[in-house]
């Protein structure tokens, strides 16, 4: 027999909310769950292309790499683009 009063309360009909709408009910230790994304509005399942950026990571990446310049060598000259050596094939 389990010890009394050590387990959290179980809510068999906990409501899951997304954008203020109840989307499903599940069993949980919390009476309500709030989610930003679920299968009904996820870009993979809906077929739409949408950037999900909850914390500004995309903007930070774009700011960081938007003004990039070609890397320079130690002497201050621009690095030459790498090219593969050409081979002459006869026959």
Swiss-Prot record:
Domain of life: Bacteria
Record's keyword terms, sorted: Ribonucleoprotein, Ribosomal protein, RNA-binding, rRNA-binding
Keyword Cell division: no
GO CC list: ribonucleoprotein complex; ribosome
Pfam families recorded: Ribosomal_L31
InterPro entries in the cross-refs: Ribosomal_bL28/bL31-like_sf, Ribosomal_bL31, Ribosomal_bL31_A, Ribosomal_bL31_sf
Annotated spans, Disordered: 62-91
GO biological process: translation
GO molecular function, one term: structural constituent of ribosome
Keyword field contains ATP-binding: no
Function: Binds the 23S rRNA.
Family: Belongs to the bacterial ribosomal protein bL31 family. Type A subfamily.
Description of how the protein assembles with itself and partners: Part of the 50S ribosomal subunit.
Alphabetized HAMAP family for the sequence: Ribosomal_bL31_1 (MF_00501)
Name this polypeptide is given: Large ribosomal subunit protein bL31
Native source organism of the sequence: Thermosynechococcus vestitus (strain NIES-2133 / IAM M-273 / BP-1)
Lineage: Bacteria, Bacillati, Cyanobacteriota, Cyanophyceae, Acaryochloridales
């Amino acid at each position: 027999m389990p010890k009394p009063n050590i387990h959290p309360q179980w809510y068999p009909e906990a409501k899951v909310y997304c954008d203020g709408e109840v989307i499903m009910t599940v069993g949980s230790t919390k009476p309500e769950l709030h989610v930003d994304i679920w299968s009904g509005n996820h870009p993979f399942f809906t077929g739409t292309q949408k950037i999900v950026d909850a914390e500004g990571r995309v903007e930070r990446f774009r700011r960081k790499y938007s003004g990039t310049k070609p890397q320079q060598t130690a002497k201050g000259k621009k690095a030459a683009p790498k090219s593969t050596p050409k081979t002459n094939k006869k026959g």
